Amino acid sequence: MQFHELQKKVISCMKYENPKILVCSGAKRSGKTYVLTFVFLMHISKFKNKGYSFIIGGTTQASIRRNILNDLEAILGKSINLSKDNHFRLFGNKVYCFDGANADSYKKARGFTAYGAFLNEATTLHDSFVKEVISRCSGEGARIYMDTNPENPTHSVKVDYIDKDGQMLSNGQLNIKAFNFTLYDNTFLNKEYVESIEASTPSGMFFDRDILGIWVASEGVVYQDFNKDIHYIKEANTELKKIFCGVDFGWEHYGSIVVVGLGLVDRYYLIKEYAYKHKDIEYWIGIAKEIIKEYGNVNFYCDYARPDYIYKLQINGIRAINAKKDVLEGISTVATLFKTNKLLILEDNVNIFKSEIYNYVWAKGKDEPIKSSDDVLDSLRYAIYTDMKLTGSKFNRSKFGI
């Protein structure tokens, strides 16, 4: 097995300083999860044939399998199969796998003493689960390992653990040690891959967190890579393999339907914007029918805050589907398309978009935008992000003189 220099420092820390809590945070693809998987394996091996219990915590059972168990299998050279209560045996001990994203997940960790835990993607776990798992690790010699990507610097994982790096117990034992990883620490990544990731990661918060591993608060304009000289076009004489729509219902603020096309080279086009105030659902049904008449029976990905409106669209023969509204992931998706010039806007067919793109800003101290100047941009996000996540309507390839 090979480790880069920072991974070696983590292993050395585990061997010689042996902190009660060891945290690796930082950039994606930097090697922090892999080294902690190895370290956790070393820790369990110290208790061979003791019949003790250990914990692996992750967002879901699927993420635990993907992020940890697959690597464990590769290291051990054997398959890991979970029992009905989601444990497997290792070195004569039991390792329990708990998903910990929900408020009541802490209940899964109750009822036994653990001799160690590995919390994967710790910022995605509920704080009560993290604290319950740590409290369970009361066996003599128990150790806790966490890995995570950076989020807002006020997150409990940073405040309660990372910011206490170097904390000592009264007996001289190191309690908490934290390591920070950047993408550049992983020297096993080839130069071409690193350059590609740099080029495709949106500027600002996303670059600081995903590449530099910095716990930074969001601030300023959300879509920093939008460039009117690049992203506005007059026409898109291209073949489109798919067309779909995003819908954000409104009244005092703008209601919006956007028409989005996906080209043959996987470039998205904002073809047209419909944005109006004080329009009832009957008006939007009419707009949707106009769109269907022009482009075919396309999908409409809708804000599900108004299920009654979605129902009315559906009974009028419109393929209205609940949008996926994950704010940060959706924004990251659209921001990446702007960064890579994979999202272009037909300038003459939009109006409200032109002001929103410059006034859509992050809420101070929060990983979410201010709820203002977001109507067309929300519908655009719903359209693109949902279509990427779902299997959208198939659209016969044809040439549009757009």
Which role fits each region the language model picked out?
Residues 1-21:
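Conserved pre-motif I regulatory segment
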Residues 124-200:
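ASCE P-loop NTPase helicase motor core
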